[in-house]
């Protein structure tokens, strides 16, 4: 486990009490995260902790089709309901290392520092993705704030420095990027097959799509005005312009 990110239980306890000198997390701010989107469909996702935060994490994993397993002796009503309807598997006991077997991603959402450290250390030994909620020293990945509209997802992260600031930025981004952006993404996806089959190089395909997105008239403004037909005409015109000339 990275020494710069984790210096033992004392460091974690100080961090949670707000008296940490921050040396244990400074490296996280100085080293940029590798941003990626994970495909969770059908993958086992472990959540340890049955409180409201655990419920929030479970709902996020379910929204991405993860196969969620909850480990907790007790759970809030929302989690109980998800287990009762079969949406999640609920193991009603304290965490054990074997719970990580065949697991893709683990999230610890308990208020017990010892359990959180055990989950982190056990997952690190398995080279597994693990996040202990609100304790950056016990994370090898962090969960950004997400603005999601249809296929459009925008992630906002402060590298764990300030979740509150990330949420403020999320609200501002959500106001700026509305449903018209998601609709344009869907419309552009409809011609991806044509582009791959017709335009011979990556640079050709890049120029085709950028010509639509950044062209005039602005497709976003057209969609804001409800003129989807005009956007389809823009796309059709770009197809004619970029298609290779017949031999």
Regions found by a protein language model. Give the residues of each.
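Hydrophobic, well-ordered beta-alpha structural blocks that scaffold small-molecule cofactor pockets
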Residues: 13, 18-74, 79-82
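Residue-level detector of alpha-helix initiation sites
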Residues: 52-53, 114, 160
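Glycine-rich, highly charged phosphate/nucleotide-binding loops
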Residues: 83-101
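ADP-ribose/adenylate-binding Rossmann-like module
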Residues: 105-111, 116-143
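E1/E1-like adenylate-forming module used to activate ubiquitin-like modifiers
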Residues: 111, 132-182
